[in-house]
């Protein structure tokens, strides 16, 4: 697919699929269960007349396990590969997760990922901009994207996504490499809505770039299943984040209670909604706001079972009324999340 085709396929999406939590955990989800969920995502996307979107990572678990799952899935279901757009993160040290954005490191990351996945990758993204390589006055290292452009010319990847970038970086990279850019991946949820206030979302709208919204369920906070730090399994990185300490949760869960009591519980039985569906609906409702009409907000929840996929990908259920959307945003003006996105306890 050309970059234009990739952008068009992404723009058709309502919801994409994040595969990180299948493997980046103390005990990976068994392949058989993961494959059922992955297959259901493709099935639902087909029914809606567009490709599925798989968001994967070179470092989402040891020994390329995340990419191995994708490789084995398509080995089992080869006819489904044409129905999926794969976006892969790399460009980092797989052990320490520090950015490795040199030309040779990025080329090697792409080649490692292509080898692990078993072939062509539609979209590749350096997970974090390696600012250690920037010379004075630069906001991103040219060589990282020069390497990706070479990989596109060699036909091993199709386009570039940006990841965890700021407004200045988006503009600079778009100026130099815009013909290769397909989308921008950043965090957006009711607990982390910075992109709506720091210029990122407005810049994407101005430049016509879709916004891939990771962690739309607040890393589990918006599922209703987390009540205390003890609910987080040992070995899960969230356990050591300030946002998920018991003291922080007491304050952060006030938002969840508001959503449950003022939105979920007040819905009639014939139009029920879950907390997760509400959270996804809030992200997608920004597509109705005129100032963002040039972009497309696409949440990429996970889903380790068919039932979770069905819940998260129910496009009729994951909708809010304008009144609900406005009530939530009014509440958010006085609510402040305790703990930054990656702040340790």
UniProtKB/Swiss-Prot annotation:
Quote the SUPFAM superfamilies the UniProt record gives: NAD(P)-linked oxidoreductase
What's its catalytic activity? pyridoxine + NADP(+) = pyridoxal + NADPH + H(+)
Respond yes or no to whether keyword Nucleus is given for this record: yes
Q: What is the enzyme's main class?
A: oxidoreductase
What Enzyme Commission number(s) does the record list for this chain? 1.1.1.65
Q: What else is known?
A: Present with 2190 molecules/cell in log phase SD medium.
Q: What is the recorded name of this protein? A: Putative pyridoxal reductase
């Amino acid at each position: 697919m050309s970059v234009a085709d990739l952008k068009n396929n992404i723009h058709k999406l309502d919801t994409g699929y994040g595969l990180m939590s299948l493997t980046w955990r103390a005990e990976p989800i068994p392949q058989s269960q993961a494959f059922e969920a992955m297959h259901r995502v493709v099935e639902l996307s087909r029914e809606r007349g567009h490709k599925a979107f798989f968001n994967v990572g070179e470092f989402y678990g040891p020994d390329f396990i995340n990419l191995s799952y994708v490789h084995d899935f398509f080995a089992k279901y080869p006819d489904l590969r044409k129905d999926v757009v794969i976006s892969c993160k790399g460009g980092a040290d797989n052990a320490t997760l520090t950015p490795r954005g040199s030309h040779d490191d990025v080329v090697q990351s792409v080649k490692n990922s292509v080898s692990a996945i078993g072939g062509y990758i539609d979209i590749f993204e350096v997970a974090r901009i390696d600012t250690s390589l920037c010379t004075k006055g630069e906001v991103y290292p040219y060589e990282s994207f020069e390497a990706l452009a070479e990989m596109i010319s060699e036909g091993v990847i199709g386009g570039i996504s940006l990841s965890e970038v700021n407004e200045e970086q988006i503009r600079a990279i778009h100026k130099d490499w815009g013909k290769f850019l397909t989308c921008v991946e950043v965090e957006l949820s009711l607990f982390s809505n910075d992109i709506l206030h720091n210029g990122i979302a407005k810049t994407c709208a101005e430049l016509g770039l879709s916004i891939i919204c990771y962690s739309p369920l607040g890393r589990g906070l918006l599922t209703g299943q987390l009540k205390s730090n003890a609910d987080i399994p040992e070995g899960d990185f969230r356990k050591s984040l300030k946002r998920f300490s018991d003291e922080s949760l007491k304050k952060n869960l006030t938002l969840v209670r508001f959503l449950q009591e003022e939105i979920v519980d007040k819905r009639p039985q014939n139009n029920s909604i879950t907390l997760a569906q509400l959270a996804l609906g809030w992200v997608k409702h920004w597509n109705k706001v005129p100032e963002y009409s040039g972009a497309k907000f696409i949440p990429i929840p996970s889903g380790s079972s068919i039932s979770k996929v069905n819940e998260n990908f129910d496009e009729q259920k994951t909708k809010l009324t304008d009144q609900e959307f406005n009530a939530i945003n009014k509440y958010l003006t006085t609510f402040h999340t305790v703990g930054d996105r990656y702040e340790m306890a």
